[in-house]
């Protein structure tokens, strides 16, 4: 997936911008307050339907204008598709391929941008949930099976946890183990493959920039030498005691 064309109107300080982009690398250079960050923000908005800087649409609309528009052309193994976003003080309108779309997920399925900003250090400083979100967004970008697998896993996890919290017979929770284990193993495999793709590049960056050996390792959330179904069964009594599932990809 590559953004190869971009049009921005009345977004932040940008009055009207039209760019043809390289599918792989683009470098934006300019003076302070010239609009570089606003341009990146517009690209992010095109793929996420939101900003990484603010939740208030009126702050993104250029002063004196009623709305902003962002249109981009995305290519991926074919002629490509046009994505569009219109933001007003009343809300956001999304179009995919010229047709109205229901949610920002329709944008992300074609163009899921990832941003590395000054807060990237929080990936190391904060808990594992932030790292899981960062990792999962990357997997979603390259693995088409990821989203349905992720949804299937979390649907089963919610049902199992609900059964555990209500304190009924163990069979009410165990009935979800097969679905949870199947989706969990598949989800972990997708994550693991993505980490394997990233690891060589990260190691090279560590050597060249820091002079250090850097390794990227994925800990999947249960014993490495054990199937998830076995771990779920072994931990059932603890799960019933605390009303939650303690092993699985959600604990990675």
Question: What label would you give each PLM region?
Answer:
Residues 44-130, 135-146, 196-204, 229-240:
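Nucleotide-state sensing region of NTPase/ATPase domains
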Residues 1-31, 45, 52, 57, ...:
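Conserved NTPase motor "head" modules and their coupling/switch loops across ABC/AAA+ ATPases, GTPases
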Residues 122-123, 129-174, 178:
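Long, charged N-terminal accessory/stalk domains
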Residues 31-33, 148:
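Juxtamembrane helix-loop transition sites at the ends of transmembrane segments
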Residues 36:
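Conserved lysine of the Walker
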């Amino acid at each position: 997936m590559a953004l190869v064309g971009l049009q921005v109107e009345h977004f932040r300080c940008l009055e009207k911008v039209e760019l043809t982009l390289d599918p792989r690398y683009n470098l934006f250079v300019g003076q302070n307050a010239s609009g570089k960050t606003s341009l990146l923000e517009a690209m992010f908005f095109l793929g996420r339907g939101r900003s990484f800087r603010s939740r208030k649409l009126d702050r993104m609309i250029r002063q004196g204008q009623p709305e902003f528009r962002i249109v981009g052309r995305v290519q991926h193994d074919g002629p490509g598709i046009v994505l569009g976003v219109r933001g007003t003080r009343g809300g956001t309108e999304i179009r995919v391929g010229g047709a109205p779309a229901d949610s920002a997920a329709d944008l992300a399925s074609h163009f899921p941008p990832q941003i590395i900003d000054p807060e990237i250090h929080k990936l190391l400083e904060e808990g594992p949930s932030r790292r899981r979100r960062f990792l999962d967004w990357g997997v979603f970008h390259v693995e088409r099976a990821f989203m349905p697998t992720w949804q299937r896993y979390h649907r089963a996890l919610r049902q199992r946890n609900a059964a555990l919290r209500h304190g009924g017979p163990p069979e009410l929770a165990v009935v979800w183990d097969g679905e949870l284990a199947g989706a969990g193993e598949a989800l972990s495999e997708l994550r693991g493959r993505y980490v394997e793709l990233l690891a060589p590049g990260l190691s090279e960056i560590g050597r060249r920039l820091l002079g250090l050996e850097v390794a990227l390792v994925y800990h999947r959330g249960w014993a490495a030498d054990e199937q998830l179904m076995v771990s779920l069964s072994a931990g059932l009594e603890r799960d019933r005691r605390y009303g939650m599932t303690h092993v699985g990809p959600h604990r990675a």
